[in-house]
UniProtKB/Swiss-Prot annotation:
Protein name: Tyrosine--tRNA ligase
Domain of life: Bacteria
Subunit composition and interactions: Homodimer.
PANTHER family, per the entry: TYROSINE--TRNA LIGASE, MITOCHONDRIAL, TYROSYL-TRNA SYNTHETASE
Swiss-Prot/TrEMBL catalytic activity: tRNA(Tyr) + L-tyrosine + ATP = L-tyrosyl-tRNA(Tyr) + AMP + diphosphate + H(+)
Keyword NAD tagged: no
Organism annotation: Rickettsia africae (strain ESF-5)
Function: Catalyzes the attachment of tyrosine to tRNA(Tyr) in a two-step reaction: tyrosine is first activated by ATP to form Tyr-AMP and then transferred to the acceptor end of tRNA(Tyr).
Length: 411
C-alpha cells in the first residue's frame, strides 16, 4: 500500500492543497515532510499521537520526517482556535521541553543522518536572528491582511471582541516562513498539521510559490475527540503523557483499556499497526468480545509507546487488581514522609496529596459519592484520620478512586 493510500485508509486525511498531484509525486519519489509541535511541556501527550504516527508512516514508506520544535514561535503563541492569549515560554523551559519532546518522538521514529531518518529542528535557529526591517522588506508584501482577517482563528476572536495581540497576529507569518525556510534549505515539499492549521499551512505554500515557484503541498488531519466528545489527551486526572516520568506505562495501558466501546475500531486504525485482517475482526466484534479487544488494543499501544516488557507488566498488574483482587507492586507509587502518617492526615487530604484528584474539594466530592477506597475498604468519612496503622506490611497504603484508578502510598 502506498503512503497516501495508507494515510487515507487509517483515517488521517482531512484536506489537501492538491491530493491527486501529491499522490502522484509520492509514488514517483521520496519527499521530505514536516510537522510542528508546541514546545510548552516536557513530554507530548496522546493528543499529538496521530501526528506522531503519521511521522512514523512517512518513515516506513521511505520519506524523510522533519520535526519542528517551536522554540521561536513559542515565544509568541499561536492564536489558532484559542479563546485566550497563549502563555509565553522562557528560553530555559524551551530547551528542557525540547529534550523531553525528542524523547517522546524517539519511541516511534528513528532520528539520524540516513535518507529517511528523522531530523528535529528548532525554528529559533532561524527566527531568533531575524532583522525585523529586513523581514518586512523581503516578505511583507507577500502577505494579505485581508486574507488573514478571514481566517477562522482570527475571526473568532474579533467577533467575540477578544484581545488579539500583534505578537500573535505575526504567528501566521512566522509559520509561513518556517515552511519557506524548510523548502529552501531542506527541500521540504509537504507540511502536515491539524485541520485548525489549514490557513497557516496554505499561507506558507503560497509564500513559497510566489517567491521560488516550487511545487509544495499542505495536508491536514481531522481534529479528534472521543465518541462522547471528550478531547483526546485529557482525562479527569490530567493529560495522558507519552513519557513514563510523567505517566506510568500502567496508567497509559489503563487509559486505552478503559476507552469507550464505540472508539475501539477507530483507535485501532489511528494508533496501532494491526494488520487489515485484525482490523476487520475488530469491526465485527460481538458484545462479549469487547473487553478482550480493549485489552489487546491497550497492550499493543503500550508496547508501541513503551516496550513489550512494559505492556506485559501493565497487563499483569491489571489482572492482579481487577481479576484477582491483589495488590501489585507495579501500581503507580507516590512517597509520603513517614512523619506525615505518624502525625495523621485526613482521608481527603491524603487523596489530594497522592495525586488521585486535582483539588481537596474534588477529594471531598469523591468520598461523599462513595468513590474512594483505602486498602479496598470504602471511605465513608472524609475527615477520617489516616495514620501508620493503615500501612499494609508496614510499608504501603492502597488508594482507589473509582474502580479503575489506583495508587500505592509508600513511606
Amino acid at each position: 500500500m502506498r503512503f497516501i493510500e495508507e494515510f487515507i485508509n487509517k483515517g488521517y486525511f482531512h484536506q489537501c492543497t492538491d491530493l491527486d498531484r501529491l499522490t502522484a509525486i509520492t509514488k514517483e519519489t521520496k519527499i521530505a515532510a514536516y510537522i510542528g509541535f508546541d514546545c510548552t511541556a516536557t513530554s507530548l501527550h496522546i493528543g499529538s499521537l496521530m501526528q506522531i504516527m503519521i511521522l512514523r508512516l512517512l518513515q516506513q514508506h521511505g520519506h524523510k520526517p522533519i520535526v519542528i520544535i517551536g522554540g521561536g514561535t513559542s515565544k509568541i503563541g499561536d492564536p489558532t482556535w484559542k479563546d485566550e492569549v497563549r502563555k509565553i515560554v522562557s528560553k530555559e523551559d524551551i530547551a528542557k521541553n525540547a529534550e523531553g519532546i525528542k524523547k517522546s518522538l524517539s519511541k516511534f521514529i528513528k532520528f539520524g543522518d540516513g535518507k529517511s531518518d528523522a531530523i528535529m529542528l528548532d525554528n529559533a535557529e532561524w527566527l531568533d536572528s531575524f532583522n525585523y526591517l529586513d523581514f518586512l522588506r523581503d516578505f511583507g508584501s507577500y502577505f494579505s491582511v485581508n486574507r488573514m482577517l478571514t481566517m477562522d482563528s482570527v475571526k473568532l476572536r474579533l467577533e467575540r471582541e477578544q484581545h488579539l495581540s500583534f505578537l500573535e497576529f505575526n504567528y501566521m507569518l512566522l509559520q509561513a516562513y518556517d515552511f519557506y525556510y524548510l523548502s529552501k534549505h531542506y527541500n521540504c515539499s509537504l507540511q502536515l498539521g491539524g485541520s485548525d492549521q489549514w490557513g497557516n499551512i496554505v499561507m506558507g505554500a503560497d509564500l513559497i510559490r510566489k517567491i521560488s515557484g516550487k511545487e509544495v503541498f499542505g495536508m491536514t488531519t481531522p481534529l479528534l475527540t472521543t465518541s462522547s466528545g471528550a478531547k483526546m489527551g485529557k482525562t479527569a486526572a490530567g493529560a495522558v503523557w507519552l513519557n513514563e516520568d510523567l505517566l506510568s506505562p500502567y496508567d497509559y495501558y489503563q487509559y486505552w483499556r478503559n476507552c469507550e466501546d464505540a472508539d475501539i475500531v477507530r483507535f485501532a486504525k489511528l494508533y496501532s499497526e494491526f494488520t487489515q485482517e485484525e482490523l476487520n475482526r475488530f469491526e465485527s466484534l460481538a458484545a462479549e468480545d469487547i473487553n478482550a479487544a480493549k485489552k489487546q488494543l491497550a497492550y499493543e499501544l503500550t508496547k508501541l509507546c513503551h516496550s513489550e516488557q512494559a505492556a506485559k507488566s501493565a497487563l499483569e498488574t491489571a489482572v492482579k487488581i481487577f481479576e484477582e483482587g491483589q495488590i501489585d507492586e507495579n501500581l503507580p507509587t507516590v512517597v509520603l514522609e513517614k512523619e506525615v502518617l505518624q502525625a495523621g492526615i485526613s482521608a481527603y487530604e491524603l487523596f489530594h496529596e497522592a495525586g488521585l484528584v486535582t483539588s481537596k474539594s474534588e477529594a471531598r466530592k469523591l468520598i461523599r459519592g462513595n468513590g474512594a477506597k483505602i486498602n479496598d475498604r470504602l471511605v465513608e468519612d472524609e475527615n477520617m484520620i489516616i495514620n501508620t496503622n493503615f500501612l499494609l506490611d508496614k510499608k504501603v497504603i492502597k488508594l482507589s478512586a473509582g474502580k479503575k484508578r489506583h495508587i500505592l502510598v509508600r513511606v
